[in-house]
Swiss-Prot record:
Its cofactor is Mg(2+). One of its GO terms (cellular component) is chloroplast. A motif (DXDD motif) lies at residues 390-393. Its main location: plastid. This is Bifunctional levopimaradiene synthase, chloroplastic. Mg(2+) 4 binds at residues 390, 392. One of its GO terms (molecular function) is copalyl diphosphate synthase activity. Involved in defensive oleoresin formation in conifers in response to insect attack or other injury. Involved in diterpene (C20) olefins biosynthesis. Bifunctional enzyme that catalyzes two sequential cyclizations of geranylgeranyl diphosphate (GGPP) to levopimaradiene. Levopimaradiene is the major products of the enzyme with abietadiene and neoabietadiene. No activity with farnesyl diphosphate (FPP) as substrate. Its EC number is 4.2.3.32, 4.2.3.18, 4.2.3.132, 5.5.1.12. A motif (DDXXD motif) lies at residues 609-613. Mg(2+) 2 binds at residues 609, 613.
Amino acid sequence: MALPSSSLSSQIHTGATTQCIPHFHGSLNAGTSAGKRRSLYLRWGKDNQAKKFGPSKIVACAGQDPFSVPTLVKREFPPGFWKDHVIESLMPSYKVAPSDEKRIETLITEIKNMFRSMGYGETNPSAYDTAWVARIPAVDGSEKPQFPETLEWILQNQLKDGSWGEEFYFLAYDRILATLACIITLTIWQTGDTQVQKGIEFFKTQAGKIEEEADSHRPSGFEIVFPAMLKEAKALGLDLPYELPFIQQIIEKREAKLQRLPPDLLYALPTTLLYSLEGLQEIVDWEKIMKLQSKDGSFLSSPASTAAVFMRTGNKKCLEFLNFVLKKFGNHVPCHYPLDLFERLWAVDTVERLGIDHHFKEEIKDALDYVYSHWDERGIGWARENPVPDIDDTAMGLRILRLHGYNVSSDVLKTFRDENGEFFCFLGQTQRGVTDMLNVNRCSHVAFPGETIMEEAKLCTERYLRNALEDTGAFDKWALKKNIRGEVEYALKYPWHRSMPRLEARSYIENYGPNDVWLGKTMYMMPNISNEKYLELAKLDFNRVQFFHRQELQDIRRWWNSSGFSQLGFTRERVAEIYFSPASFLFEPEFATCRAVYTKTSNFTVILDDLYDAHGTLDNLKLFSESVKRWDLSLVDQMPQDMKICFKGFYNTFNEIAEEGRKRQGRDVLSYIQKVWEVQLEAYTKEAEWSAVRYVPSYDEYIGNASVSIALGTVVLISALFTGEILTDDILSKIGRDSRFLYLMGLTGRLVNDTKTYQAERGQGEVASAVQCYMKDHPEISEEEALKHVYTIMDNALDELNREFVNNRDVPDTCRRLVFETARIMQLFYMDGDGLTLSHNMEIKEHVKNCLFQPVA
């Protein structure tokens, strides 16, 4: 009989956690009794680095013949980092105060009201567009403005420096454009001489700053409307520096752009040129252009463009649109309106990325129902009646609607792909922005099987975004954000399948700008998208949830210690890392019990994996499995001491879990839990048997067992009982062992594990992995080719997992999340290597710290 680990440790003291795995010399008889194994050791030093004992990195036990019997390589794990004293040292002083709870409730109410009050979109005044509307002469023929309140607004809203625009943010392009529009309007109406002179002085002294700004900050249509207005200003006799080099350059750009414009394109179909008709008045056929008027009477939602058309045509629908906008805003107009689809989609995206969406489920549903009711297979724009779709709103809509279960097709992206396979924001546009390409990239990761357009979008946008990170001038065509670079870096490093909600929330809290602005024809703000309330709630909520998580982790540490598991010398102690898993995705306070069950079950899968994988003899493993099957504590007397600790802890823990499950489900669940574990232990046993005889199965045989032995299904099937839902047998079957959903979770988890660990485990004597088994089936291919094929299988399975997650609506939402997020956490843990075993010197350690111990400021 093999010695228990305590005796092995007394022979050769390693000072670290160790594990034996079967390792046979090729000349040995594979049928040698599993009860007569010899042990070899690999040591970990105090610096957690492997100690090498010669070329083989092993050392034989004294007094044993190295060729007489099958051997074991004794695998050692680095000790756990998150010991009690480490956790205690990191405990912040933060506690949830009653005032915090009250403030959270207040903010939730205010944000709910914000969502419920959403109409056509809230935004700020545009001095530029207001100046164009103020030009309109009265329709009654009097020599007065049709909208005198807009003229008065211009007179009252000049800034101290003589410019017009947003006071808190200086963008030379925006200020110069708005100021030029306002002084022209005041000159036309022969009023505000003082304001005009101050505006001219501002223009003269500040226009040159445009040369210092990035081209990407140039507002939409600037090269069209700015030269046209300069021509007007010159005709009005305004004393401006018309000969400045940059002005001449912009005029040349305009001429070149107009020369490239096909004569009939302007009238063939709606394009972004409709947004800037005020700058094209000398070439527009006003009768033809009316065919492209939007249903609401506007031209691409632009008050300035619509005002110019009205002054040329007297079209009543144009006037109705302008009256509609002024009825909403009073004495000014924004740069475009409505913005109803844009506002709703970005507001939903904001609360989701900040991690506060769980407070606004009804509001989110209402917002998305509205967007979906205006969804178009050709794409959508920023407003429901916008005739020109854009990839930014379309990609955001496709991703969010799909993830919330709405039936939307990825074919919608084909509208925005040119003949070279590149993606663009608007039809006929060649320049792209970082924010729109970022949204397409985020969208591309929620692909379903066979959606080649999504794969093409992913590759195209990844290439663009990586180049953008190297080019500071690429930030950004459509927005001035606090840290768009940080958003891009996060998206590329943690794409959808490894972006856990708590980590994304932490990152976005740091990157989110409550004063972010967007770039249209002028700079504009969206207060229902960017505001301090979202950020304040996100910080308070994150710290509050984190406080509860720390308390739960301490409870689980006490369970671990009281169960005697810290005495086990053969297994990995990764309590904090394992608790981090459910805390990173099922983080809401109401799921505390589910997190505890998930963590305890996961810890047992690690203990028993290490036990069955290498430590126990086959006889003892079969005894352990039989004890679980019979649920018989008396059999423990026949076990070695460390296995006694395992089984007693297992037996007591799952009796407690079953009792709690009975209360929640209203029926006995112990037999269900037993059966879940029986299947799991059968998979472990099969792997142990394969290892004992160095059997390399076929790929299909291996995956059939390995997708179970990865143990994710066991964790999910038991934890699901505590998601707050009554789970009928029918529901359980939809996430059960025979379900495609659960299989894909196990498959992707197994494959990402194998791709990152097979080389190290092969060096330690393991003979079966997805890569090795595939190579056995296909001896003609190289290891590199086999690895590439396994990655392809995994990527395809992740796409299918997306579809199962989205379409499996018969399964309660929390159960769907449990399955899907468990698959995602595996992608995170194994993104760069074995993030569980080697968590002490990998990024997982920082994730644990940021998620559980570091409050946000």
